[in-house]
Amino acid sequence: MSMKKIVALIFGGKSAEHEVSLRSAKNVADALDKDKFTPVLIGISKEGSWYRFPDMGVFTEATKIVDSALPSKAEPVALMSLQGKPVLYSLKDHSKTAVDVAFPILHGTMGEDGTIQGLFKMVQLPFVGCGVWSSAAGMDKEIMKRLLAVAKIPNARYLLLTPHQKNDYNEIVKELGSPFFIKPANAGSSVGVHKIKTAEDFVVKLKDAFQFDTKVLAEEFIQGREVECSVMGHNHAPKASLPGEVIPQHEFYSYEAKYIDDNGALLKIPAELSPETTKAVQKMAEQTYQAMGCDGLTRVDFFIRPNGELYINEINTIPGFTKISMYPKMWEASGLSYKDLISQLIQLGFEKFEGEQSLKTSYLD
């Protein structure tokens, strides 16, 4: 009988989505098949420090991890490579723990943007999810839109705003119409996203958006249904779930609607779409997955206009795994249980790593 694999569940992080990450991580830890895997819980504080936690108590003791008020039994650790093998090194007692695979559940910056994926590759640790460049491109909404344009995949029109240029409300309205949205290029969970209706509102809300990124997109408002689709698999063979629909009860699907107001949105899973529209959503989700170089998992978000036209809103390379998160729910509606989903995602991580290990890293040998 094969030994159980040690899975490092990594959560928290120096991100505006830190608290959401802890909620996701608890659900993944609960769903992990303990007959196949042994979890190691690694929380990254809001300051960027790494800690190992001995049990699930971390999720009940705190909604966030901060260096000044750590949950009990937090052990400072570092991820490193020793003799070509990835290990967790204790900064407390200098012990070393072997790790077989990482499951990053880090939403937003310093986790979903390719940074930690680069660390995993440096220490030769298999990991769940997209690689460095697809994570970075998926996180940056402007780069995502450029890649989708090359692939001729429709998405909302936009303008790029920076702090160093004149950002004129009237020019934006002339180009995109009114109302329009502004959103930080590198943020998720609707952090810093605002619907703009007046010049006065634009000044205030743009200042808020620039708190989260140095690039902000002004994006046209698309009147239509908000539909999402889960995708998993290797880049050459993606598989899409049945779509689900989000019906916001706020003006749009804001951070508050997602995570604070229990009645912030209605979720219909599967979405009530015609068979033809369902297939079109699944096909475009898979095309987007491939165009963005995704591997492992991604959630693809759509707008559907009243005339049936599909537009990509964005992709999420580490989608939420909270109680209300669409990614696992859409797979459950498609016949894949939460536990089996997690197991398959881990297996995909191992397969991707094995394929990369077969590549040569020396030219003269």
From Swiss-Prot:
Keywords: ATP-binding, Cell shape, Cell wall biogenesis/degradation, Cytoplasm, Ligase, Magnesium, Manganese, Metal-binding, Nucleotide-binding, Peptidoglycan synthesis. It is found in: Cytoplasm. Pathway: Cell wall biogenesis; peptidoglycan biosynthesis. ATP binds at residues 173-228. Binds 2 magnesium or manganese ions per subunit. Its cofactor is Mg(2+); Mn(2+). Disulfide bonds: none annotated. Mg(2+) 2 binds at residues 314, 316. One of its GO terms (biological process) is cell wall organization. InterPro entries: ATP-grasp, ATP_grasp_subdomain_1, D-Ala_lig_Van_CS, D_ala_D_ala, Dala_Dala_lig_C, Dala_Dala_lig_N, PreATP-grasp_dom_sf. It catalyses: 2 D-alanine + ATP = D-alanyl-D-alanine + ADP + phosphate + H(+). Residues 145-347 form the ATP-grasp domain. Its EC number is 6.3.2.4. One of its GO terms (cellular component) is cytosol. SUPFAM superfamilies: Glutathione synthetase ATP-binding domain-like, PreATP-grasp domain. Belongs to the D-alanine--D-alanine ligase family. This is D-alanine--D-alanine ligase. It comes from Bdellovibrio bacteriovorus (strain ATCC 15356 / DSM 50701 / NCIMB 9529 / HD100).
